[in-house]
Amino acid sequence: MKWLPNAESSQRPGMNNQEDLLNDETNEDLESLLRLSVSQIIRKEDSEQFLHWFRDSAMLIAPEFFKQFPNDLDARCSFLSVFGRAIWNRTPLPSNHFRTRSLPKPERNAPCTCGSGRKFKQCCASVETLGSPFENLSLLSFVLDSLSASQREALPYAYLNHEELAFVARQWMEEGREKESVKLLEGLFADIS
């Protein structure tokens, strides 16, 4: 997984307790879900279309990941809604200079985003207020993986989060992708100077 360093954690950078909770199969399922989600987001950059796709597809793509949740339809719908929004909110968008474009937090009395027909405060608000266990998850590497080499060379480095870029470069080094990592860092340093 692609976990950003947690400033409050004494663990090695890039690791969080969340990763320790996932077994290999679950981790692979979640990584596939995130990769496909980012691909879907990048393809259209349409939040409504993505959230609809996510609600319909997530459990089919990552069955091992979703086995760890109670077999309660309302709870799963709530989680899918909140998790889909979290993925959207963490995905850097090419049309926004590779910065995120977060969805507004639903109003308490507005219809719930999960489609239940209930008010948000009576439905998914309790799930959303728990905070996201994925707040330190980096989706930038999935975004960059979806780009061609020429698109990567033209990245608007001034707009990108430099800490996250450095994290992705280190991750790629660990994966044996040294040349790609160097090109990413060269672009970053060229933009800084």
Please provide the spans of the model-predicted regions.
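Acidic/negatively charged segments and metal-coordination signatures
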Residues: 1-193
